[in-house]
A protein has these predicted regions:
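Bacterial N-terminal signal peptides that target proteins for export
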Residues: 1-8
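Lumenal/extracellular ectodomains and adaptor appendage modules
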Residues: 19-190
């Protein structure tokens, strides 16, 4: 990527970040489909993210795809963004994404993150940086059926239990979250 392209992408990102809620900018984070699989010691996330562009010309912007990092959530040991060149920096994968004029663009991401406690968190509060809600957010959260005391902080629309797994499903429209998706469980031995 040339210096000019980086500068232009950076300026566009700054312009998007500086927009007020009334004028959220030409890029809209429209939908996401998220599959979270939790087990003691690790969490895996597979997500597909869809955007619309209202601009008359192609827009390039730097996308920052964040991971929780704290005493429980280690740095991801695997990150995959198919078809994308990305850099890992701080607590995120960053890449340039091009949005076609008056069109849609999507990306898929997968990561595996080590856990050293009895909690797994998926960041959704970063949605607020887009300055308007996501039209539709769909989640599937799966844990081992024998994970003691497993709870989800969002109310599921439905639940499916098998001999080996418990899966929560929930969809939110006009999703503008004030808290991340969090799964907690008892740290006593299974």
């Amino acid at each position: 990527m040339t210096t000019t392209t980086r500068l232009a992408a950076g300026l566009i990102l700054l312009a998007l970040a500086a927009c007020r809620r009334e004028a959220a900018g030409p890029i809209h984070f429209a939908r996401e489909e998220i599959d979270i699989t939790v087990r003691p010691g690790a969490v895996e996330v597979l997500g597909t993210y869809h955007f619309t562009c209202s601009a008359e010309e192609t827009v390039a912007a730097i996308i920052s795809y964040p991971f929780p990092l704290d005493s429980v959530h280690g740095y991801p040991d695997s990150v995959v963004l198919p078809g994308r060149r990305f850099e890992l920096a701080d607590s995120a994968a960053r890449f340039v994404m091009r949005f076609p004029p008056r069109g849609e663009a999507s990306f898929t991401a997968w990561y595996r993150q080590p856990l050293s406690g009895s909690e797994a968190r998926y960041i959704v509060t970063s949605t607020r940086q887009w300055r308007r809600p996501i039209d539709r957010a769909q989640f599937r959260v799966t844990v081992p059926a024998d994970l003691p005391g497993a709870t989800l902080n969002y109310r599921p629309d439905s639940t499916r239990r098998t001999d080996s797994t418990l899966t929560w499903f929930f969809t939110r429209l006009r999703f503008y979250p004030s808290e991340d998706v969090i799964v907690r469980w008892s740290d006593r031995a299974r």
